């Protein structure tokens, strides 16, 4: 199973790299990449959730690991709808395949709305397990932030996931982040005042 996941990841990311080499370095048709590393510091547990995204015009490609389940890889293809004036939006419906500890498929949606320094970001999916309907699950990660400066933002966050367990079905928290050039660092603190508080540190780079 690990060999199958590794081969899938190699060809998915390798294909994106080949396309990137063929694309011009600048201009409206160039590839844009975004790599994330999400570090979960949970009581008596720790894991990393990496995400890689590639966009070219309307095309959106994405790869995730440890998202739907531990030791599980998912690959996605989607279509970007972008526009707006005062209210800017990016809406990306997607379809993904999931292999690893969990095997299935998932329709998904990513939404980003920007208005006068406020941003709502939400990513959701309905995981459909190939083995049993009892494993079907609705995932969601949503952040609402305000940026007083281009390099600084803070806000609230909510997650619904199965990769870790707490007493709450929906993890709720606060966040603060900062950026420098193409790098971003965001720290989340979830479930303050409840039984299972934990910290998430997210590092991302655009290139």
Placement of each model-derived feature along the sequence:
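Glycine/small-residue-rich loop that forms an oxyanion/phosphate-binding "nest" at active or ligand-binding sites
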Residues: 73-97
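Outer-membrane beta-barrel transmembrane domain signature
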Residues: 27, 31-34, 39, 43-45, ...
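N-terminal Sec/ER secretory leader and immediately downstream segment
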Residues: 46-51
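Cleavable N-terminal export/targeting peptides
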Residues: 1-29, 207
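N-terminal carbohydrate-binding/catalytic regions of secreted carbohydrate-active enzymes
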Residues: 62-63
């Amino acid at each position: 199973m690990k060999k199958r996941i590794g081969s899938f990841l190699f060809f998915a990311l390798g294909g994106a790299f080949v396309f990137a080499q063929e694309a011009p370095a600048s201009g409206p048709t160039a590839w844009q990449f975004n790599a994330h590393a999400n570090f979960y510091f949970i009581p008596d547990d720790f894991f990393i959730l990496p995400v890689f995204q590639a966009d070219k015009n309307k095309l959106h490609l994405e790869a995730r690991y440890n998202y739907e389940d531990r030791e599980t890889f998912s690959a996605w293809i989607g279509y970007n709808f972008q526009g707006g004036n005062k209210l800017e939006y990016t809406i990306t419906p997607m379809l993904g395949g999931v292999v690893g500890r969990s095997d299935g498929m998932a329709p998904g949606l990513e939404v980003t709305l920007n208005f006068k320094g406020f941003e709502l970001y939400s990513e959701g999916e309905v995981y459909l397990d190939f083995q049993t309907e009892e494993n079907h699950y609705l995932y969601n990660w949503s952040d609402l932030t305000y940026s007083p400066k281009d390099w600084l933002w803070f806000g609230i966050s909510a997650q619904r996931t199965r990769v870790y367990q707490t007493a709450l079905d929906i993890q709720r928290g606060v966040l603060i982040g900062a950026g420098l050039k193409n790098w971003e660092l965001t720290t989340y603190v979830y479930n303050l005042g409840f039984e299972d508080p934990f910290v998430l540190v997210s590092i991302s780079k655009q290139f």
